[in-house]
A protein has these predicted regions:
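Bacterial N-terminal signal peptides that target proteins for export
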Residues: 1-11
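Bacterial N-terminal signal peptides
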Residues: 9-20
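A domain-level signal for caspase-like cysteine endopeptidase catalytic cores
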Residues: 25-92, 100, 104-105
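Extracytoplasmic/secreted cell-surface and envelope-processing proteins
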Residues: 41-43, 66-67, 89-95, 137-142, ...
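A short, glycine/acidic-enriched catalytic loop
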Residues: 88-118, 134-136, 150-152
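Short, conserved loop/helix-junction motifs that constitute active-site signature segments
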Residues: 115-124, 184-185
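Active-site-proximal C-terminal subdomain of hydrolase catalytic domains
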Residues: 131-292
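Non-catalytic all-alpha helical scaffold/repeat segments
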Residues: 253-553
Length: 553
């Protein structure tokens, strides 16, 4: 009998162990990593977290472009997610390593989040660690300008209500990096990131070591760690939480997800665009980026399908939406916004391409008449006319001789094809007025100097300049279109020993480094530069690089 009881006890114990084993395994937390750049953070987590309590999974497969989709199919469920990569532009995590090509676009993260196409992988996330610059920067990427309030008043709101609603819409549509990350990681209780510059992996690793050595691990608890935030505080680490359905941005997230959700057809997405454009135009303006982006993504194949074609035709035929949209566009304060809205109106069939050009030229005419043409206007005009689509439109602008003589106006006219404007801008580049030189810089960023004659004119003009700041700017402009003719290069070589400014000498070196050295006596020039160069106040510089280049060649 005692033997039977002993055997029965052993059997029960064995069954209990077998049943308990999956529970024990299930209790292990899974730390997933997306290592786009530095592996220091991931390796520190692996080194300090006990492997009997944590599983570690790297989601990136080198050389496999569809690594995220492949990870979604594995059945892995992450409790913790580490993402390491540069993030300065706010559009993707990327690497500066030459031996790696992997990257993680924010668009892809939004698609996965909105489509719920990867429900297992991120369904039980408790913590996300975003090791990249500005990942949780709260600065607004979009702002509500004064026309928002004017539009709401036209729609029937009182002035006070319009201002209050504009503030609310501005906050809702600000779309900072922080907002993007919160929307992507919906319902995740703890999201760590950086409001500014983040430490590189080689610096972040030791800080994480100090965190793990300072006390018991809190990783995967779903609670923000004051110890971790304290250690990274000098590096701008901050924390946020993913929104739930009660969050003030939940409605915006639902709207934005319409364009990223793979479960919706293109026709359904175009239908949502039409629904959205029936709202207050103030909100349409603040959502313009998403509308433009989706419209641009519709290829000819999509547009040619009966369902999409019919949905677009409904938008084109909506006279009320067209009238309200164009009224808002013509009242917009920022020329860039006005141009974008006119272009979008063309995409929607509300304006012909000739009418789009006419609206833009009308806008530029108003800017000239009001004396408001700025560097931003010049940049916009040159960008819009990169493909010469405004050829033949210049006669629409009736600038007076006095107006055409102002350098910002001359540059705008030059961007649109004016030969007189082009000549005025070239003279302004070497005229000594810093503001005019800045305008010329912007213009020549988009347009090339026309041959050796213009090169020589600019080079000799620079040599005669007296104002140091303007001279440096002019030289920096020339360095983007370095001369190759001997006469232009000799003008700059003669200027080098005459100037009393090390900044001017450095700027000359910047031009000569990029120029064709074939017409120069390289050994003699290297000796002359070394003999006449001014002492550098802060170590090696562009002049040293040029001297080495001349000696090597």
């Amino acid at each position: 009998m005692p033997v039977a009881r002993s055997a029965k006890f052993a059997f029960v114990a064995l069954v209990s162990f077998v049943l308990a084993a999956p529970v024990a395994l299930a209790d292990k937390k899974t730390v997933c990593s997306i290592t786009v750049n530095s592996a220091d953070e991931r390796e520190t987590f692996k080194r300090y977290l006990p492997h009997d309590e944590y599983n570690f999974v790297e989601l990136v497969e080198r050389g496999r472009p569809d690594w995220l989709a492949a990870s979604c199919r594995t059945g892995i469920k992450c409790d913790v997610l580490l993402i390491s990569g540069h993030f300065d532009g706010g559009t993707e995590f990327y690497t500066d390593r030459l031996d790696a090509r992997e990257y993680l676009p924010v668009d892809e993260m939004e698609r996965v989040a909105c489509s719920e196409s990867c429900p297992g992988l991120f369904s039980q996330l408790k913590e996300v660690y975003l090791f990249g610059c500005n990942t949780l920067n709260a600065d607004a990427l979009h702002t509500a300008s004064a026309e928002i309030v004017r539009s709401l008043v036209r729609a029937g709101y009182s002035a006070n209500d319009a201002e209050a609603l504009a503030r609310m819409l501005g906050e809702r549509h600000a779309e900072s990096n922080r907002d993007h990350m919160r929307d992507i990681f919906k319902d995740v209780p703890v999201i760590y990131g950086f409001s500014g510059k983040a430490p590189l992996g080689k610096s972040a690793g030791p800080l994480l070591e100090r965190y793990f050595q300072s006390g018991p691990s809190e990783i995967g608890s779903g609670r923000a760690s004051t110890r971790l935030l304290g250690l990274f505080a000098p590096s701008s680490m901050t924390v946020a939480a993913g929104p739930d359905e009660a969050d003030s941005r939940a409605g915006f997230r639902r709207d934005a997800c319409h364009f990223s959700d793979d479960r919706l057809t293109p026709a359904q997405k175009v239908g949502f665009m039409h629904e959205f454009m029936r709202r207050d135009m103030a909100e349409v303006r603040l959502f313009l980026h998403h509308l433009e982006k989706y419209s641009a993504s519709l290829g000819n194949d999509d547009r040619g399908t009966p369902a999409v074609s019919a949905a677009l035709a409904e938008i084109a035929g909506d006279a009320s939406a067209r009238a309200r949209f164009l009224e808002f566009a013509r009242d917009a304060d920022e020329p860039t916004v006005r141009a974008r809205m006119f272009s979008f109106a063309g995409d929607m069939g509300w304006l012909t391409q000739a009418e789009v050009r006419g609206e833009v030229m009308q806008m530029f005419g108003e800017r000239i008449a009001q004396g408001k043409v700025s560097a931003a206007d010049v940049n916009l005009a040159c960008k819009l006319n990169q493909d010469n689509r405004f050829a033949g439109e210049l006669p629409r602008l009736h600038a007076t001789p006095a107006q055409a003589a102002r350098i910002p106006n001359a540059a705008l006219l030059a961007c649109l094809g004016s030969a007189d404007g082009h000549a005025r801008v070239l003279r302004a580049l070497t005229g000594g007025n810093v503001d005019d030189v800045q305008i010329a810089q912007i213009y020549l960023h988009h347009r090339q100097l026309a041959g050796a004659d213009e090169m020589r004119m600019v080079a000799s003009g620079i040599a005669r300049m007296n104002a140091t700041d303007a001279q440096v700017r002019a030289l920096n402009t020339l360095s983007r279109q370095p001369p190759s003719d001997r006469e232009s290069l000799q003008e700059l070589v003669r200027l080098f020993p005459l100037t009393r400014s090390v900044d001017v000498q450095r700027a000359i070196a910047g031009v000569l480094i990029r120029a064709d050295h074939a017409s120069l006596e390289k050994p003699e020039l290297a000796v002359a530069l070394r003999k006449t160069r001014l002492k550098s106040p802060d170590g090696g510089d562009m002049i040293d690089v040029l001297i080495r280049q001349l000696q090597t060649n």
